[in-house]
């Protein structure tokens, strides 16, 4: 089939127009820049996962493959001009299993996680991630634990297996106890699965707090610039001797300590900036 006369010229003009339009949108529209950056962020992770899969497949499903993923993802913060400052890393217990609990703000949490991720540590993620193309397969090969949150019985069974794995294989797990991303600049109530897990295995809980991203990232405002994020590792919370009845108080105590630190590092000029001081940020009423 032949193209009508002038079709090639028209396609060339459309291509040139697109080349001119993209830079214009980039420099003149913060919203367009936000979508471009997020699209590249997700696409780049999927591409890196494609590269990681053959390397990880040599070992099969193995926690050690998380080191490969971490190595391949660490550079992303430089692409976006995000400086990640880690404090308190000495609080990680050196030679025992434990449960990490961290606040969950957006997919950018991956940058802070990779910066501070301890050895033999894998995240617990929602099962939907398993079907996220190359990223899902790479995560599976790295030993990420997937849970179907809609099926409570299955989730409890998986957590019981994880408790045994913690003790027998010296593995650490990373959990986002809020259960979902929280964009409002505070912390959602904690789900108790991670705390039941720690109490069942009688291993410590290591809280990790990432400062607010509001100075450089806001989904609602379609804003994504460069900035700094502080990741604070808090002292481990022991669970020896605790029973299931102690879990609610334990979860509340850990959340309170994390929220206090979150407010501190998100307003001191070294973390997420002064968002919490602004109208609409987290004040006493937001708690």
Curated annotation (Swiss-Prot):
InterPro entries: AGP_acyltrans (IPR004552), Plipid/glycerol_acylTrfase (IPR002123). It is found in: Endoplasmic reticulum membrane. It is an enzyme of class 2 (transferase). Pfam families: Acyltransferase. Its EC number is 2.3.1.51. It comes from the Eukaryota. Pathway: Phospholipid metabolism; CDP-diacylglycerol biosynthesis; CDP-diacylglycerol from sn-glycerol 3-phosphate: step 2/3. Keywords: Acyltransferase, Endoplasmic reticulum, Lipid biosynthesis, Lipid metabolism, Membrane, Phospholipid biosynthesis, Phospholipid metabolism, Signal, Transferase, Transmembrane, Transmembrane helix. It is a multi-pass membrane protein. A motif (EGTR motif) lies at residues 178-181. Residues 27-37, 149-192 are lumenal. Residues 59-127 are cytoplasmic. One of its GO terms (biological process) is CDP-diacylglycerol biosynthetic process. GO terms for molecular function: 1-acylglycerol-3-phosphate O-acyltransferase activity. One of its GO terms (cellular component) is endoplasmic reticulum membrane. It catalyses: a 1-acyl-sn-glycero-3-phosphate + an acyl-CoA = a 1,2-diacyl-sn-glycero-3-phosphate + CoA; 1-(9Z-octadecenoyl)-sn-glycero-3-phosphate + (9Z)-octadecenoyl-CoA = 1,2-di-(9Z-octadecenoyl)-sn-glycero-3-phosphate + CoA; 1-(9Z-octadecenoyl)-sn-glycero-3-phosphate + hexadecanoyl-CoA = 1-(9Z)-octadecenoyl-2-hexadecanoyl-sn-glycero-3-phosphate + CoA; heptadecanoyl-CoA + 1-(9Z-octadecenoyl)-sn-glycero-3-phosphate = 1-(9Z)-octadecenoyl-2-heptadecanoyl-sn-glycero-3-phosphate + CoA. Residues 1-26 form the signal peptide. The keyword Magnesium does not apply. Converts 1-acyl-sn-glycerol-3-phosphate (lysophosphatidic acid or LPA) into 1,2-diacyl-sn-glycerol-3-phosphate (phosphatidic acid or PA) by incorporating an acyl moiety at the sn-2 position of the glycerol backbone. The HXXXXD motif is essential for acyltransferase activity and may constitute the binding site for the phosphate moiety of the glycerol-3-phosphate. Belongs to the 1-acyl-sn-glycerol-3-phosphate acyltransferase family. PANTHER family: 1-ACYL-SN-GLYCEROL-3-PHOSPHATE ACYLTRANSFERASE (PTHR10434), 1-ACYL-SN-GLYCEROL-3-PHOSPHATE ACYLTRANSFERASE ALPHA (PTHR10434:SF65). This is 1-acyl-sn-glycerol-3-phosphate acyltransferase alpha.
């Amino acid at each position: 089939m032949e193209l009508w006369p002038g079709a090639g010229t028209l396609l060339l003009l459309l291509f040139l127009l697109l080349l001119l339009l993209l830079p214009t949108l980039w420099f003149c529209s913060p919203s367009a820049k936000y979508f471009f950056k997020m699209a590249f962020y997700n696409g780049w992770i999927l591409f890196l996962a494609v590269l990681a899969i053959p390397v990880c497949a040599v070992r099969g499903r193995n926690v050690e493959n998380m080191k490969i993923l971490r190595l391949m993802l660490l550079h992303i913060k430089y692409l976006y001009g995000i400086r990640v400052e880690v404090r308190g890393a000495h609080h990680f217990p050196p030679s025992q299993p434990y449960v990490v609990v961290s606040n969950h703000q957006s997919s950018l949490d991956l940058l802070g996680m990779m910066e501070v991720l301890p050895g033999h540590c894998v995240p617990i993620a929602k099962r939907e991630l398993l079907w996220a193309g190359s990223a899902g397969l790479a995560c599976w090969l790295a030993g990420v634990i997937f849970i179907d949150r809609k099926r409570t019985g299955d989730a409890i069974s998986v957590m019981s297996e994880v408790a045994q794995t913690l003790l027998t294989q010296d593995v650490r797990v990373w959990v986002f106890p809020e259960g979902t991303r929280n964009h409002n600049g505070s912390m959602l109530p904690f789900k108790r699965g991670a705390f039941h897990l720690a109490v069942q295995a009688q291993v410590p809980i290591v809280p990790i707090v990432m400062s607010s991203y509001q100075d450089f990232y806001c989904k609602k405002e379609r804003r994504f610039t460069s900035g700094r994020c502080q990741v604070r590792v808090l002292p481990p919370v022991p669970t020896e001797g605790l029973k299931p009845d102690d879990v609610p108080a334990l979860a509340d105590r850990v959340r309170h300590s994390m929220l206090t630190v979150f407010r501190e590092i998100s307003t001191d000029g070294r973390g997420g900036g002064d968002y919490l001081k602004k109208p609409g940020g987290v004040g006493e009423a937001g708690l």
